[in-house]
Curated annotation (Swiss-Prot):
Full protein name: ATP synthase subunit 9, mitochondrial
Complex and partners: F-type ATPases have 2 components, CF(1) - the catalytic core - and CF(0) - the membrane proton channel. In yeast, the dimeric form of ATP synthase consists of 17 polypeptides: alpha, beta, gamma, delta, epsilon, 4 (B), 5 (OSCP), 6 (A), 8, 9 (C), d, E (Tim11), f, g, h, i/j and k.
Modified-residue entries (N-formylmethionine), positions: M1
Principal location listed in the UniProt entry: mitochondrion
Record HAMAP family: ATP_synth_c_bact
Gene that this polypeptide is encoded by: OLI1
Annotated site location: Reversibly protonated during proton transport: E59
GO cellular component: cytosol; mitochondrial inner membrane; mitochondrial intermembrane space; mitochondrion; proton-transporting ATP synthase complex; proton-transporting two-sector ATPase complex, proton-transporting domain
Positions of transmembrane segments: 14-34, 52-72
Molecular function in Gene Ontology: identical protein binding; lipid binding; proton transmembrane transporter activity
Record CDD domains: ATP-synt_Fo_c_ATP5G3
GO biological process: proton motive force-driven ATP synthesis
Length: 76
């Protein structure tokens, strides 16, 4: 029984590594936004909605990893 519990904790910890990728993705999206707007301020209205879409897609992958982690801890 202890081995199954240890495997759940290890699996949940490993599945949260995907949150690191989501954080890096969000940082890249907003770094590109800041870089683009600083070079051409008039394009802000065009680029900002795309940056929010990129943020949402990056965050969705992180939330999927978090959901898998919670399922491993509490669901199975």
């Amino acid at each position: 029984m202890q081995l199954v519990l240890a495997a759940k904790y290890i699996g949940a910890g490993i599945s949260t590594i995907g949150l690191l990728g989501a954080g890096i993705g969000i940082a890249i999206v907003f770094a590109a936004l800041i870089n683009g707007v600083s070079r051409n301020p008039s394009i802000k209205d065009t680029v900002f909605p795309m940056a929010i879409l990129g943020f949402a897609l990056s965050e969705a992958t992180g939330l999927f990893c978090l959901m898998v982690s919670f399922l491993l801890l509490f669901g199975v």
